[in-house]
C-alpha cells in the first residue's frame, strides 16, 4: 500500500486522475501469479477529498479516513475507487 497526496481544483478532477491511473494499471495486464482473486494485477483506491482542512488536522487523521476508503474498495470487489469528502 502507498499514499499519493496531490492538489487538484475539483473532486471530479481527482476522480478522473485516479480512474485514469486505475485503468492504466489494469491495461498493463501484469500477471498476478499467486493471486486467488484475479489473473492480473489491479489497484483499489481510496480517494479522500479535502476541500479545506482545519488548522488542527493532522496527517494521521487524514490517513485513517483514506485507509477506510481503500478497504471499502477492496471489500466491494477490488479494482475500483471509493471516494468521499473528508472533513478534518
Please describe what each predicted stretch is.
Residues 11, 15-19, 50-82, 88:
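Catalytic-core segments of nucleotide cyclases and related cyclic-nucleotide turnover enzymes
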